[in-house]
């Protein structure tokens, strides 16, 4: 279920992003993409079905936030098809990743990825964010194509450390979502993401409690 142009697209994209990965890491990324492409036909894991753009819109897009992933243990909420969690876990195996999703089909896919790709640094949890009870709160929580910012902080705020931050991946800058953030939350910074081969705007919003740096 792979596409002949994927290896070249990945190499070129990584070079454009100044990311140096081993051959085995690149093979893992492509194996993950093949799994996603295969399972997507039955499980509807992602809206991206054009094999020509999967490397850029799924792998490279996920890796575009890597410079902002500073925690040793990242929670990826609404993990769905494993984006950005699985690509990040492949690229930084020294960090731990917890992937949370309430859809049983999606978590079955994620568990299969962990098994087939040998990702010892990934844990998959089937459940809702509101019901999740981690041993300790997370300092960073990522979100991609999950929900509006208002819902993100409402549903997942209890999982975030007081001084933690959300890494919210968006397309166009979501002015309406930012305006609707509940009191006590703010966008600390916004970063325009450059994803080789992908059309359209991409933004990363760093969202945190307003009192974080007081």
Curated annotation (Swiss-Prot):
The keyword DNA damage does not apply. One of its GO terms (molecular function) is rRNA (guanine-N7-)-methyltransferase activity. S-adenosyl-L-methionine binds at residues 78, 83, 129-130, 144. It is an enzyme of class 2 (transferase). It catalyses: guanosine(527) in 16S rRNA + S-adenosyl-L-methionine = N(7)-methylguanosine(527) in 16S rRNA + S-adenosyl-L-homocysteine. It is found in: Cytoplasm. One of its GO terms (cellular component) is cytosol. InterPro entries: rRNA_ssu_MeTfrase_G (IPR003682), SAM-dependent_MTases_sf (IPR029063). The keyword NAD does not apply. Pfam families: GidB (PF02527). Keywords: Cytoplasm, Methyltransferase, rRNA processing, S-adenosyl-L-methionine, Transferase. Its EC number is 2.1.1.170. Specifically methylates the N7 position of guanine in position 527 of 16S rRNA. Belongs to the methyltransferase superfamily. RNA methyltransferase RsmG family. This is Ribosomal RNA small subunit methyltransferase G.
